[in-house]
């Protein structure tokens, strides 16, 4: 079973992603609502990290650069921001993929599988 860390401050979106990922019992899902909480939880090993760009205490893009210091697992950004500058910056700071909210469950699964 793959371990996934969801870093998302919107509780409803985090709940939806958790539901999608746990449907087939393919993922053990851990959630963080802030960059600080994510950094604490990231001490453990994960197979994939799903990361929001807009976190309350730090940019998800900056957090990605920090996570890259000790994680080489895929990092997928999930954000409602769909402008080119944000997407390019997220990928340049170590993101492996970028999914725009709202997203389809099947697309989320396909993107995760493509990056694992």
What is the predicted function of each stretch?
Residues 1-116:
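N-terminal/domain-start alpha-helical segments
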């Amino acid at each position: 079973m793959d371990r996934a860390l969801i870093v998302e401050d919107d509780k409803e979106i985090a709940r939806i992603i958790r539901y999608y990922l746990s449907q087939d019992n393919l993922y053990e899902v851990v959630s963080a609502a802030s960059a600080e909480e994510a950094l604490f939880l990231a001490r453990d090993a994960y197979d994939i990290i799903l990361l929001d760009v807009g976190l309350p205490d730090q940019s998800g893009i900056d957090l990605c650069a920090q996570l890259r210091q000790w994680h080489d697992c895929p990092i997928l950004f999930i954000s409602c921001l769909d402008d080119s500058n944000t997407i390019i910056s997220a990928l340049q700071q170590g993101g492996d993929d970028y999914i725009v909210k709202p997203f389809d469950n099947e697309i989320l699964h396909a993107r995760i599988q493509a990056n694992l």
